[in-house]
Amino acid sequence: MLMSFILLISTSMILISVFSYVLIALIVLGIVLSLISLLSPRVSYVSSVYLIGLTVYLNPGFSLTQSLINTVPILGEINMLSGLLKTPVTSIISSLFSLALLNLGIKGYEIYLSKHADIVKLDSIIFSQHGLPKQANWNIVVNSEVKLLKSNEKLILSNTPEAKYELCPTLVDHKYYVPNKVTGLAFEGEVIRINYSPVDGVPYEKFRNCFTVFEVEGLPPDTSFVIEINGASLKLKDRKFAKLSLEPLYWKVNEIRISREDEEEIYEPDIKEGLTFRGGTVKINFRRKVIRYKTAKIPSIENWDPGIWVGQEVYGYRVIEVIGLGGNGYVMKVEKNGLLYAMKVLSVNKFTNSLEHFDNLLKESENLEKLSKDPRLVSIYGSFVDKNNIQSALAGDYTSYYKYPPAIIMEFMEGGTLFDLISRVDLVQSKYWQYIVKLVIKEIAKALTFLHKRGYVHLDVKPQNIFLKEKINGEPEVVYKILSSTPGIIKLGDLGSAVRVGEKITQATPAYSPPEQIEAVITGKGAQPSMDNYALGVTLYKLLTMKNLDYVNYLDKAFDEYIKGDPSIAMKYINMAKMSMVNFKPKLPHNTLPELANVVQGTLVVDPKRRLTSYDIVKILEG
């Protein structure tokens, strides 16, 4: 009995320390009634009624619907229980517990009695979830702000008079769990319990604001399509599907090709990419287009005629004409959506390392596109390389090469190539020609410096790959003035031949390649910037003399022998070319500008380490 009295007195002192003096008398009366209930259990009824009334009076959040239902009854119920049991122990426990709950009420708390036993401050709102797997997270939008929470985590909002909330399903292990509420309004002092339950299917109809809906039209039945959403690719057949996401969705879809015997169906989306937000609808309409292939016999890749593509569509580009032929491919003028482009189709050769070259191109295509943004390089807009089609072509299926050739889409250069300018006798024989040549070589040297600093070797520098952005007509003086006053008019093209420094070389143009480049094709040695510097020197020599180098014949024979499959004889010709270079002294026109002569002599040397760098060439020509 004494211990009970001490406990009650201690509790009362704690309560008195936080109450005002006005309330002391009321509290003391409650304690007295509790003590009397220890001696006479019947007094428990009186004590219960008193404590209930006191709690209701002191609870600042009292309302008939909340306090009577949630807060008040516990005091009376426990105290009444002690009276019914008629035991002093239950009276002590009930009195202490009643006073503790009374203290919480006075401090501004509401007591919610249930299996969850929540106690919430009157100026707070609590959100909790039940029903999700332990590993799952959940989210709730409160006053337009998304809150991300762990499975067992509650959301407690303090000093919030009211909260407008919205709930969405949660996807766990490919299964949707839906909440029992969609939207609502909560007020301070409330506990909002959200119950999740699993459902079959995608519940986007009920929770429309939580999903982005994609609707696809125009495709044949059972035709799959691939859509990329936030970097993840999905292969689908459904014409209507929904994506659950809290964040914006960036989506992208490509055209679909269906091949027939002598034609190909192309289904092109009216919108290829976009950014959407949840609650939105994206409609993608595919338009059908049929390409009918020529029924003429398709030539073998060894005797390929690029003219077979003229008038046809390749990768959605209409081929207008063939504008260039080379040892490693064909260049065609193409059109798409009213704009002109150049398409280079790479040749496939059974006797060279074609697949390895295409592997490198596929791997480096994105980097080369970025590099081509330099104003002195012809821009690359895209590349199409499918190793399976190349293998089929090498195995004799030439239709694969006809329909899906390895191709690079490039900026179309209206002015043609530097090689075209050589045909103008009046220009070449004029006093302005050397200055035009100096200007061109300096710009290409700057382009090579840019590539070399970024770890790439071009490997195919020659007049045919030096382009003019605009057509230039007029007298030699006019041509020189236009070239010298128009930035970006002179560009180095065909970046598709470029590889990283040190990587294997699979191709070469003997007339412009140094001996060690052809040797590297045979032996597998890596590419070096000095190969480009030599090729630029040969280009300069060609522009000044209109002649090929004396020892080029050896390099041509070396490459021919390699193609025939006899590398040992090829190496003999390469060594003969190197010996000729040791004693080679370039014969230039007597009036050649000294700086141009220095570049020729400094680049056409047999030892790659002694050659001028592209940066050296720029300095010489700018000095």
UniProtKB/Swiss-Prot annotation:
Induction: Induced during starvation conditions. InterPro entries: Kinase-like_dom_sf, Prot_kinase_dom, Protein_kinase_ATP_BS, Ser/Thr_kinase_AS. Autophosphorylation is stimulated by Mn(2+). The chain crosses the membrane at residues 13-33, 49-69. Disruption phenotype: Deletion results in dysregulation of the archaellum regulatory network that leads to reduced motility, though the archaellum is properly assembled. Deletion mutant is still able to sense starvation and to induce archaellum formation, but with a delay at the signal transduction cascade level. Its EC number is 2.7.11.1. Plays an essential role in the controlled expression of archaellum components during starvation-induced motility. May inhibit arnR transcription and promote ArnR translation. One of its GO terms (molecular function) is ATP binding. Belongs to the protein kinase superfamily. Ser/Thr protein kinase family. It is found in: Cell membrane. Residues 317-623 form the Protein kinase domain. Pfam families: Pkinase. The active site is at 460 (proton acceptor). ATP binds at residues 323-331, 344. It comes from the Archaea. Autophosphorylated. It catalyses: L-seryl-[protein] + ATP = O-phospho-L-seryl-[protein] + ADP + H(+); L-threonyl-[protein] + ATP = O-phospho-L-threonyl-[protein] + ADP + H(+). One of its GO terms (cellular component) is plasma membrane. This is Serine/threonine-protein kinase ArnS. It is a multi-pass membrane protein. Keywords: ATP-binding, Cell membrane, Kinase, Membrane, Nucleotide-binding, Phosphoprotein, Serine/threonine-protein kinase, Stress response, Transferase, Transmembrane, Transmembrane helix.
